[in-house]
Structures are given as C-alpha cells and as structure tokens.
C-alpha cells in the first residue's frame, strides 16, 4: 500500500494488513481539526461529535468556547474536560478570553473569540490583562454587520467584505502591542483578508485557516438556510483568492468550523449560523483543491505546527483514503446530530475508508467500532 508521510513529504510503499479490501487505497497520518463546535443540552454532544470526527478521519479536534454556558470559567471548563475524557478522539479546548480563566492547563491550547460578540475597548482591556497564549481569532467588526456580504443576491442587511480584513489587522496589531505573539485567524473568507494576512505574517507569528464551504461555494450558490454561516460566503472572486492562497501557503490550515444544528428554520432571519461538515471535510477539500499531498499537509502537519505539537508517522496510527471514490453527500446519514450541511446532495471525490489509532481499528467504512477492546 502507498503511504504518504506529510512530515517528511515522502511516499512509502509498505504491506499493511487490513480487515477490508485495500486495493487502490492510500494511507496517511490522521487529521487534526482546529475548529469544531459542541452544543450539549440536547444538541451535538461529545459522543456524537466523536463518531462524526472518526468517520471524517479526525483524531484530534479543538472545541470552541461558544457553548451554553460559555467556556469562560473553571467550572464550565472542568465539565467539558470530564465529558470529553477517555475517548478515541482527543478533544482540546480554546477558552474564552473574556472570562475568569487563563488559557492554560489540561488540554487547553489557547484563547478563542469564536462566536463571542465583543467591542474594541473590551478587546484592548482583555489583551492588557490576560496571560499571553495562542490567540484564535474570529475576526469580525460587529459595529457594522449583516447576515451576508455586500453583493450577495439576497434582500437582507449586508456587511462590507472589508469587515473581516479590518478586524484581522485590529486584533493582530493590538495583540502585538500588549505582548501576544501567536495568532491564528479563523475561517478566512475574502481576498482582502488574504492580502492583510500576507502582510501581517511579516510582523508576527500569524497562521490562518479556511473552511471547506468557503473553498467550495460562493454567495451565488446560496439555496437555503444551510448556507447561512458566519462569516458568510464570499464572492466568486473571493473563493478563487482563497484557493490560490491555500496553494501558496498564505492559508496554512484546513479547518471545518463544524457547526451542527439538528434543525434549521427556513427563515434566514431566525435560522442559526452554521454548517455541518466534519464527516465530509476531506472529500470536500480534495474536490475543491485536487491535490492530495496539499490537502493532507494542511489537515495534519500544519495544524499540529499551530498547536506546537511534534508528531511522526507510524504504521499503527493511520487514516485510509480512496482518492478515486465518488459519492453524493446524504446529510441524513451523518453520525453528527447536525444535518444542516450545505454539501447535502453534492457529488464529492475522495473518501475516508477507515481509521486506525494506536493499533486499533476505530472506524471502518463509515461505521464506528463501539468496543475498541475487541481489536486487541
């Protein structure tokens, strides 16, 4: 079997025993997602998110803080740590910078502003006081806002496409002034943001990510409320700029922003933001970019670099992929409790077939193996 090592940028040929037909498959290091959401309280819990992650080929994910209640206190964080422990997927946490806790301790990787509305004075005061850590930034100027970007063919309040880029510059420059050194810009959406990030990389340690939906769709593709996401879909020109930025390494990481909702109303004004994507992230990225090595690098090596984690490829921990398989997405079959995917009904190329972690088969052909001890 052909194995791709993203850390050495090298293809290897090895014989690997599998409990499924392996002709035509390739294997590589399992995926890392820097951006997922959990709902609890009847929504996406850690069991369903774990299953969805494994089906997608992910073994390590970073949970964002905008749960109910926010992960902004020791008590709430400890609850999440307890609910997510002892699982096949390693759940890491980015906590709110606006609460009473610091970004330190067990499985905590940094601060995140994702899904938290704040103003500039609050940002300044927070950056002055908090211990310096990796800062995940949802870059948005809430003072001038709207459901979609200007140019979207829908009769709703719009936000300028420059909104995100201005917020990115504001966060990074303010953070530098108050001692922050590492910034990770979340879900980049416009050509303006790409240009600003490219410049800021000369001043600070800045990385960024893009979602599968922003690479695959633009605002001309909006059909229903599954396409209501924050930040919104950009223009066709923005989508092309994002693809080019991934190829040129201006965009470092591919991250899903997996935002599950069991049901979304048909009304754009009342429907929540978000799209479910972690189970079909690899094929969505592969279909959009068409470069297996590039996609694997930005789902493995690059997100681990953002986290400051060193890793190496071993034969007991692999994800198995069929790069030629094509299928039509059926969101009703997702393991996630969220069926709100804008990819529903879309034909994609590339399929995650199986996942092996520390010598144990944890997922085969879309089914999670419940009792992993049976693999011993």
Curated annotation (Swiss-Prot):
Pathway field: Pyrimidine metabolism; UMP biosynthesis via de novo pathway; (S)-dihydroorotate from bicarbonate: step 3/3
The keyword Transport appears for this protein: no
InterPro entries: DHOase/Allantoinase_Hydrolase, Dihydroorotase_CS, Metal-dep_hydrolase_composite, Metal_Hydrolase
Cofactor: Zn(2+)
EC id: 3.5.2.3
Residues noted as binding Zn(2+) 1 in the record, renumbered to the chain: 35, 37, 114, 257
GO cellular component: cytoplasm
Biological processes annotated in GO: 'de novo' UMP biosynthetic process; purine nucleobase catabolic process
Keywords tagged on the record: Hydrolase, Metal-binding, Pyrimidine biosynthesis, Zinc
Active site residues according to the UniProt entry: 257
Annotated catalysed reactions: (S)-dihydroorotate + H2O = N-carbamoyl-L-aspartate + H(+)
Group of enzyme by EC: hydrolase
Residues annotated as binding Zn(2+) 2: 114, 138, 187
Binding site for substrate: 37-39, 66, 230, 261, 273-274
Keyword match Zinc: yes
Cofactor binding: number and manner: Binds 2 Zn(2+) ions per subunit.
Domain of life: Bacteria
One MF term in the entry's GO annotations: allantoinase activity
NCBIfam families, per database record: PRK09357.2-1
Family: Belongs to the metallo-dependent hydrolases superfamily. DHOase family. Class I DHOase subfamily.
Function, as annotated: Catalyzes the reversible cyclization of carbamoyl aspartate to dihydroorotate.
Protein name per its UniProtKB record: Putative dihydroorotase
Name of the gene: pyrC
